[in-house]
Amino acid sequence: AKDVGDLTAILCARLEEEHNKPAPVLSRMVARLRPGTKRRRVNGSDDFIVDNNRINLAAPDVFKHDPVNLIRIFRLAQQNNLAFHPDAMRTVTRSLKLINTQLRENDEANRLFMEILTSDNAEVVLRRMNETGVLGHFIRAFGKIVSMMQFNMYHHYTVDEHSIQCVAALSEIERGEQLDDLPTVSRIMKGKINRRVIYLPVL
């Protein structure tokens, strides 16, 4: 079921991309009037481009050239508020074999992941990482709970989705959005805490 859902997400992104494409003649006219506005480099990396407000690959071998890019693409999309181009998503899923022990222990990859995890909109990017398989391959313990069901009154989603929603809930508490319902923990989260120590176990 998860594979079907993941493929559907890629297909929907592709259909939306095709729907948003202007007619060829109009596209050429706009390109002449506003050169360089449709495709440009992503701020912070030469390996990715912005393609119709979606992050895409500057070259087909960016992941093979530097496997850290499998994590970096998500952080850059998060920082620049970009959606994901379907071609990029498809290439990510085909490059999962590059996520090995060396990448899991890479300082830069771990730094980027922790920045993703502790950002305000972490759940959006974590969910996309999960859909492409990157999250489960990068954090092997998480990979074991992907698509796992627990049949009781407290679990309406798969365990992996519940974990991602827990990160979202923790972020809401930290922003003070649950002050009325959870005053004590809200005050604690506003104090001097190690955010990495708090967020990582929740995931």
Regions found by a protein language model. Give the residues of each.
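Amphipathic, non-membrane alpha-helical segments in soluble helical-bundle scaffolds
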Residues: 63, 156, 160-163, 191-192
